[in-house]
Curated annotation (Swiss-Prot):
Pfam families documented for this protein: ACPS (PF01648)
Protein's name in the database: Holo-[acyl-carrier-protein] synthase
Cofactor: Mg(2+)
NCBIfam families: acpS, pantethn_trn
Keywords: Cytoplasm, Fatty acid biosynthesis, Fatty acid metabolism, Lipid biosynthesis, Lipid metabolism, Magnesium, Metal-binding, Transferase
Compartments it resides in: Cytoplasm
Function comment: Transfers the 4'-phosphopantetheine moiety from coenzyme A to a Ser of acyl-carrier-protein.
Transmembrane segments: none
Listed EC numbers: 2.7.8.7
GN (gene name): acpS
Major location (coarse): cytoplasm
Length: 126
């Protein structure tokens, strides 16, 4: 049974401009330590960050909170399985809310084109 659905879109150029203004501080606000390692290795840091931003916003919307009520960007970690499928791991307040909602499955899709990155998150329980 679907208990949460969230979608977000991020303009890559806008994220690149924020990076140019604020540098690593902007990335640190959005990314976990493990994601920061990947960010530093990325040749397209603005695109990388826009995709993570959209995914985390989509996840927070699926939980029903947005980035508020104690839920922060650091409560969400994006990684990939061996085949490249995106995975979403929850921690902190986001994990607490997911437990209360009895979330058993999290589905994440991330896509990007020239100007935009977008993500959709579906939360399921049995």
């Amino acid at each position: 049974m679907i208990v949460g659905l969230g979608t977000d879109i991020a303009e890559i150029e806008r994220v690149e401009k924020a990076l140019a203004r604020s540098g690593e501080n902007f990335a640190r606000r959005i990314l976990t330590d493990s994601e920061l390692e990947q960010f530093h290795a990325s040749k397209q840091q603005g695109r990388f960050l826009a995709k993570r931003f959209a995914a985390k916003e989509a996840a927070s919307k699926a939980l029903g909170t947005g980035i508020a009520q104690g839920v922060t960007f650091h409560d969400f970690t994006i990684s990939h399985d061996k085949l490249g499928k995106p995975l979403l791991t929850l921690s902190g307040q986001a994990a607490e809310l997911a437990s209360q909602l009895q979330i058993e499955n999290i589905h994440l899709s991330i896509s990007d084109e020239r100007h935009y990155a977008m993500a959709t998150v579906i939360l399921e329980r049995r």
